[in-house]
A protein has these predicted regions:
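Catalytic toxin/effector domains delivered as secreted proteins or via bacterial secretion systems
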Residues: 3-182
Length: 182
């Protein structure tokens, strides 16, 4: 096929590994980041479908992971003078980003409220959880954004702080993988 012409003699796995996570669909990219973070936090992975991706029994912390390409049209405006390869070629839409993060935080609050005294982990075991009346339930929202978004770190942190004040969910912004060319 013509679209494979420049990959002749190259293993498909090598081509796939060079594809930025940010070129994948939202769902595919999100699942990949959840798997990656579950791998980085052994024994904390939660079974799919619970509304929570990680659970730390020691601190009674429920965590969910979402990815957000802040350079996508939904979350930023492209500055026509740039070529789209630098973060400075974009102006972030603060209110759109905040609305999305708040929706994620509210969904996490609902998911945690629906969890009783145990949660099924990704390895199939049931893990005991402490109810709010016994031990405070910490809620953390991890938002994975493109590496280049560090240019907007202060704005993103400001939004994260507002979400925590408004919802009680701590928001951690993490920067992974490049999304822009150049």
């Amino acid at each position: 096929a013509a679209w494979l012409a420049d990959t002749e003699g190259v293993k498909l796995s090598d081509v796939a590994s060079k594809t930025s996570a940010w070129q994948k669909s939202d769902m595919e990219r999100g699942k990949d980041y959840v798997s990656e973070l579950q791998g980085e936090n052994p024994h904390q992975g939660v079974k799919n479908g619970v509304g929570v991706d990680l659970y730390d029994q020691d601190s009674n912390t429920f965590t969910t992971v979402h990815s957000m390409n802040v350079f996508a049209a939904s979350y930023s405006d492209y500055v026509r003078s740039g070529d789209g390869t630098k973060a400075s070629d974009y102006i972030l839409k603060r209110e759109k980003i905040k609305a999305a993060l708040k929706a994620y935080a509210n969904a996490l609050n609902r998911a945690v409220d629906s969890i009783s005294e145990s949660i099924e982990m990704s390895d199939g075991t049931d893990c005991q959880t402490a109810l709010e009346k016994t031990m405070h339930r910490e809620k953390v929202l991890i938002i994975v954004v493109p590496e280049e978004a560090t240019e907007f770190a202060s704005l993103l942190q400001e939004i994260a702080n507002e979400i925590e004040q408004e919802t009680g969910v701590k928001v951690n912004i993490t920067y992974r993988d490049k999304a822009l060319g150049g």
